[in-house]
Amino acid sequence: MSVSFEKKTKPYSHWEYSNPEFDSSIRIVPERGGLITEWRSEGKELLYFDLDRFLDRDKSVRGGIPILFPICGDLSEGYLSGGKQYFLKQHGFARDLPWSIDLLKDKSGIRLKLSDTNDSRSYFPFFFTLLMDVCLKEKSLQISTKIYNQSKDPMPFSFGLHPYFQVSNTQKIKIDGLPEKCIDQTNMKVTNVSDQIRILDKGVDFLSYPSSSVKLFDSLSRNVIELIHQEPMDTTVIWTDPPRQMVCLEPWTSPRNSMVTGDRKLEIKPEEYIELFTTFKHNSF
């Protein structure tokens, strides 16, 4: 059976790519930040998506897979570039801009594309192109991202994904693969991962540096989501937003404020690019 790639209007305007061989599909809204709103694997919908909130353009999105660029987290005091101070909103601007979308030549998935604009250069003074290839494989979603610096100066950046995974009950969740310690991003203090996992239903926002993949187990639905990292996109953030029954399992390249602190700060040399890889696997237990 062949794959399909078509534009649809219900329940909202979106593009849908599906692969019947794997009983899998994704929905994408390129004009809303290249947002992947749904990922279905073996017939199961895995992402949390608040449609009512999405339809209210005055509110930020809660759900899908928002794209974080050129920073992850906030940068409250701005940053210096070329002797001038610039300010960026939380998680950057990529999730707010329209992207273009195309079917990959081998039809294994779709390609999203974002380039700088006159407006973006007023707060991020660089010429760039970002290409994100999203491929559906058996029980997995593979995302590879190329970021090109088309400027004459080195381009600092962070990149991340903010996937919302729906769960049956945040009190019935197990997470494996995290280290013992993490940074509580609500107060920027080091704390125990185990203490944070115990209060997922109360709301958490913590960052860690795992040495292997991270697995999210839902004891009621029996779903398992595995985040497979590749350096430098190997920082993991866990975020919950009660009473929503979802857990965000987020791969970042760098912690918040890295453009100022230099902690895991990334730069792309002029006329060069970097390629980043992330895979999400779905299984049952």
Regions from the language model: what does each represent?
Residues 224-285:
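Active-site pocket scaffolds in enzymes
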Residues 57-113, 210-211, 277:
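An extended acidic
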Residues 1-9, 84-137:
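Extended, loop-rich substrate-binding clefts of extracytoplasmic carbohydrate-active enzymes
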Residues 1-68, 75-78, 212-231, 272-284:
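Beta-strand-rich N-terminal accessory domains
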Residues 15, 108-110, 141-143, 214, ...:
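Hydrophobic residues embedded in beta-strands of well-ordered beta-sheets
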Residues 102-110, 135-140, 167-173, 218-219, ...:
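A short, structured loop/turn motif at beta-sheet edges
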